[in-house]
Amino acid sequence: MCSFFLVLLLWQNMAVPPTYADLGKSARDVFTKGYGFGLIKLDLKTKSENGLEFTSSGSANTETTKVNGSLETKYRWTEYGLTFTEKWNTDNTLGTEITVEDQLARGLKLTFDSSFSPNTGKKNAKIKTGYKREHINLGCDVDFDIAGPSIRGALVLGYEGWLAGYQMNFETSKSRVTQSNFAVGYKTDEFQLHTNVNDGTEFGGSIYQKVNKKLETAVNLAWTAGNSNTRFGIAAKYQVDPDACFSAKVNNSSLIGLGYTQTLKPGIKLTLSALLDGKNVNAGGHKLGLGLEFQA
């Protein structure tokens, strides 16, 4: 009897692999989070007593002076595994999303996503399905377009830290596969390796290393078949203290990104960032960014 419960416990603790879109995510986060070049951004997140979540975001591009904004409300009906989401942005696009998870079957997630633009009359609807269990993560999305539905499928298998994934897109209007991607990787709590091939022409790879509790590093590499130009970058994130972190990255084009995030007080976070051209430091044209995030 004891051995039965031990086997059951080990089985339940087996890792569920990430979705195909999340493969290599840790390395991407080191390269992207904590930066906002050329933007002045304001984010506000609040949650009411009944569980209704409000998220609003606004940004201004310092070069084009264009202002963008969005508003999102989300309500979770935990008892029935339901999540209702309403979205709006300054392009006057309205969106509705309904998700049900772990109700029809354990690990199964169903989402109905629709959007409508009153200005153009454009409508869009998607049905997304996802299923995850030990060693496997499946996804299938159907995008209903005027030209004809398109089907995107993805599969990720995992075993003892090793990951292998495949993603494809089939357009019914063309009756052919228009995208075919493959990825292989290895993942532990402190180290991640990710490689991918997109459509047999684009190749990429990344390495993520958590050196210690304060320091995270990442390297990425990409190139295209028939093009000798290889894209290369390194990045690091250092947690100075519980309320502050510093980020830096550089690529083979000598573009240097710097970011600093400071928690001013609980629920208020300030982010400063700069993008410098290492080849023309004195020429100007560098980009600065400022972000404020409020959460209550």
Curated annotation (Swiss-Prot):
Presence of the UniProt keyword Phosphoprotein in the record: yes
Modified residues (Phosphothreonine): T32, T120
Residues that bear Phosphoserine: S26, S206, S253
Name assigned to this protein: Non-selective voltage-gated ion channel VDAC1
Modified residues (N6-acetyllysine): K33, K122, K265, K279
Comment text on domains: Consists mainly of a membrane-spanning beta-barrel formed by 19 beta-strands. The helical N-terminus folds back into the pore opening and plays a role in voltage-gated channel activity.
Domain of life of the organism encoding this protein: Eukaryota
Gene name per UniProt: Vdac1
Cross-link Glycyl lysine isopeptide (Lys-Gly) (interchain with G-Cter in ubiquitin): residue positions: K25, K33, K66, K122, K123, K174, K279, K287
